[in-house]
């Protein structure tokens, strides 16, 4: 089965803290919905740009798109 990487982007000087905080909520959602994550983390690309992400099976695509509204999604 294909895995999908969902990405949420944050901009500005507080982007790192926002992506870390958002990741905590993503993990809570995965636990509540009983969705297994293959990877979940955040990345700091510059002082003004960071993102948080999760990698899950593609069968959860519609559920996550509808409830969490990711900014981007890629095949992982």
Label each PLM-derived region with a short phrase.
Residues 1-76:
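Long, contiguous binding/interaction regions
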